[in-house]
A protein has these predicted regions:
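A signal for specific C-terminal beta-sheet/loop modules enriched in small/flexible residues
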Residues: 1, 64, 89, 121-124
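A periodicity- and composition-biased signal for non-globular, repetitive helical segments
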Residues: 8-10, 112, 121
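Short S/T/G/P-rich N-terminal loop/turn motif that feeds into the first structured element of a domain
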Residues: 5, 14-107, 130-132
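Short, conserved catalytic or adaptor-binding loops enriched in Gly and charged residues
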Residues: 57-58, 116-120
Length: 132
């Protein structure tokens, strides 16, 4: 009887430890993701009035937060400071809870509609960087 109790206790402890380990691994895969977008604006007025408000609203609606905005003109943006190499004219960095959430936003109807407008007034270069 005592052996059965010991085996049952060990099995229960193993399941508990395994569950904690799986939860920990899952948490590590859901790191924040930063979407770095370098922008060369060709029509600042139209970009600021037609594109920027739409894309900013779509980021917010999809759970992203814009944490950095730099470059010439628009929405209180500060200048991009050259450290090494030639800096882009404008940079926007939103952060997302996960790569999946960022990708869902990128393929959303709101973002696609905004991007059609943005492509008329700017050229974009974007890449995602995992957070720690």
């Amino acid at each position: 009887m005592k052996t059965r109790y010991t085996i049952a206790s060990a099995l229960l402890a193993g399941v508990g430890i395994g569950a904690v380990a799986v939860q920990s691994l899952h948490a590590q895969t859901n790191r924040p993701v930063y979407l770095v977008t370098e922008i060369d604006v060709t029509d600042p007025g139209a970009y600021a009035t037609e594109y920027a408000p739409k894309v900013q609203a779509s980021v917010k609606a999809a759970g992203g937060r814009i944490i950095a905005l730099g470059g010439t003109g628009g929405a209180g943006a500060k200048f991009v400071t050259q450290v090494e190499g030639q800096p882009p004219k404008r940079v926007v960095i939103p952060v997302w809870d996960s790569l999946q959430k960022m990708q869902a936003w990128r393929s959303s109807d709101d973002n696609r509609e905004a991007r059609k407008i943005g492509d008329q007034y700017a050229k974009f270069r974007s890449y995602a960087v995992d957070g720690l």
